[in-house]
A protein has these predicted regions:
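Membrane-embedded alpha-helical segments that form the functional core of polytopic membrane enzymes
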Residues: 44-98, 114, 190-203
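Membrane-interface helix starts
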Residues: 36-46
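Acidic active-site catalytic centers that drive phospho-/nucleotidyl reactions
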Residues: 82-85, 103, 107
């Protein structure tokens, strides 16, 4: 292997045991049966289509909350494909920068528009949803800067599987409670609002932690390079 290839090799760091356990389960049960002709980008596309169907279901759940079952199926499809596209790319030596970009782009679009869809459907208040919309995209942006500057693909502690499970719980609760509102200190709050607040706090914390950590490491790296 050339020195250039060694420099470009990215170290993957996954702190979540739930994420690693789920990935290994998928690799052993589904990954080994993926057809040889199927490419990582095709798997990513399947996940993106599943996610898109889930988003559409979230929009029309305004008329019937049971459409959120379709959203849950879309989340599961997207999550599975999000893990398997990387597995196929690595095991079949088909990794590419274009594929990595396509994967991350679909991740960001899926979560962003799912939040918007749930807000339009009335399950979560716009005032709360607007604070959650940028978080996942900023976490991915920060992760990409780890890759760019430190050659590390650092998964956040609250990674893809935790995010997808978060939305699955939200959908199940929204089907049960529909748009029921409770009043706390004069504020009208829905079930999804509570879930968004409880889930949003650690997500914001994780985003800020990763950004500060990256800044400190880059400053340290700059000082070491000057010496």
């Amino acid at each position: 292997m050339s020195d250039k290839n060694k420099e470009e090799k990215v170290k993957k760091i996954i702190p979540s045991k739930l994420e690693t356990g789920f990935q290994q389960f998928l690799y052993k049960t589904i990954g080994i049966h993926i057809p040889e002709k199927m490419t990582p980008n095709q798997i990513t596309l399947i996940g993106a289509i599943g996610g898109l169907i889930g988003i559409v279901c979230a929009f029309i759940a305004k008329f019937n909350p049971l459409f959120l079952i379709g959203t849950i199926c879309g989340l599961i499809c997207h999550l599975i494909c999000d893990d398997l596209d990387g597995y196929v790319a690595r095991t079949r030596n088909m990794t590419s920068k274009a594929g990595g970009y396509f994967d991350l782009l679909t991740d960001i679009l899926h979560i962003t528009y799912l939040i918007i869809a749930l807000a339009f459907a009335g399950f979560v208040s716009f005032e709360i949803a607007i604070f959650l919309v940028p978080v996942y995209a900023l976490i991915i942006f920060t992760a990409m800067n780890y890759v760019l500057y430190l050659k590390e693909f650092l998964f956040p502690r609250l990674g893809p599987i935790e995010t997808h499970l978060f939305f699955i719980v939200l959908c199940i609760g929204s089907m049960i409670f529909d748009n029921a509102v409770i009043t706390i200190c004069g504020f009208e709050i829905k079930f999804a609002d509570i879930v968004f607040i409880l889930g949003g706090i650690p997500m914001y914390y994780e985003m800020i932690r990763l950004q500060i950590q990256l800044f400190k490491r880059l400053k340290l790296k700059e000082n070491e390079d000057k010496e």
